[in-house]
Amino acid sequence: MGRAPCCDKTKVKRGPWSPEEDSKLRDYIEKYGNGGNWISFPLKAGLRRCGKSCRLRWLNYLRPNIKHGDFSEEEDRIIFSLFAAIGSRWSIIAAHLPGRTDNDIKNYWNTKLRKKLLSSSSDSSSSAMASPYLNPISQDVKRPTSPTTIPSSSYNPYAENPNQYPTKSLISSINGFEAGDKQIISYINPNYPQDLYLSDSNNNTSNANGFLLNHNMCDQYKNHTSFSSDVNGIRSEIMMKQEEIMMMMMIDHHIDQRTKGYNGEFTQGYYNYYNGHGDLKQMISGTGTNSNINMGGSGSSSSSISNLAENKSSGSLLLEYKCLPYFYS
């Protein structure tokens, strides 16, 4: 057997209370009290309401000692502190806030305070993660071992030391963890889109088998193809050189287009490096021969590049001169 209903649900009014109903309830209690029996109270007060609804309306809204209006910052602080200590025991929390009801505090928590707390926690976490990277040289702090993202920062070691070429190990040492290709590019330039990640023929998107491109890098790409592919699962020599060159070209903080040859043309220095002659620093600094190689069109000679592709890797796709990045447009 269950508890008998306090009233006939079909004969009572539901929904928000009207000002007239509030006035009737308040006037009757001020004159006669509730009589200790809320079940018979609605009939005596002339209300078509359930006895439970009358009781809650009085206790939570109409009592003369109830505070209405916005919560103060001090009340917010008390609620935060008590919630952290005892959880959602609203009646106990209400005992520490004179004039506030447990129902009022619960509703305030669910509608405003919880969102405020989550927002504050999120901002604090972001600040805590970013603070060690604001000045990596001057601050002696322990950096996280495996953060999910590389925080952006105004500090850039490449701009301060143009002779220090960017490498994975360099960026990893700055940030205190092993960085992948995508993370390195995001760290160098957060504006690079993340949706143009070209991988090898096996669609392996690991940081060893692909490279992230900016839409602005290859405006003249007609079909997005992989820079190179693996041969029997082993990265080819030309693939590693392509990635190394592209990494150097992505770091444009200390590169002068007019003297370094980064104007979208395939220079003799690039060709020599692909062909196994010269080193990368010589190619980047422009100390070697910088004459342009004609890659096509009238009077063009593409045999040197064709021979290079055959000699280096039959499965590799060479980077054509049309697709070199235009950083300085």
Swiss-Prot record:
Keyword entries, A-Z: Activator, Developmental protein, DNA-binding, Nucleus, Repeat, Transcription, Transcription regulation
Residues of the DNA-binding region: 38-62, 90-113
Signal peptide positions on this chain: none
Cell location: Nucleus
Comp. bias (Low complexity): 122-131, 144-154
Region spans: Disordered: 122-162
SUPFAM superfamilies in UniProt: Homeodomain-like (SSF46689)
GO molecular function: DNA binding; DNA-binding transcription factor activity
Effect of residue 245 to V: In strain: cv. Cvi-0 and cv. Cvi-1
Source taxon at top rank: Eukaryota
Major localization listed first in the record, in broad terms: nucleus
HTH myb-type domain segment(s): 9-62, 63-117
Family matches, as Pfam families: Myb_DNA-binding
Induction: By a shift from short days to long days, in the axils of primordia on the elongating stem.
Effect of residue 143 to K: In strain: cv. Br-0 and cv. Cal-0
Protein role: Transcription activator of genes involved in the regulation of meristematic competence, such as CUC2. Positively regulates axillary meristems (AMs) formation and development, especially at early phases of vegetative growth, probably by specifying a stem cell niche for AM formation. Modulates the negative regulation mediated by gibberellic acid on the timing of developmental phase transitions.
Name of this protein: Transcription factor RAX1
Organism encoding this protein: Arabidopsis thaliana (Mouse-ear cress)
Gene, per the UniProt record: RAX1
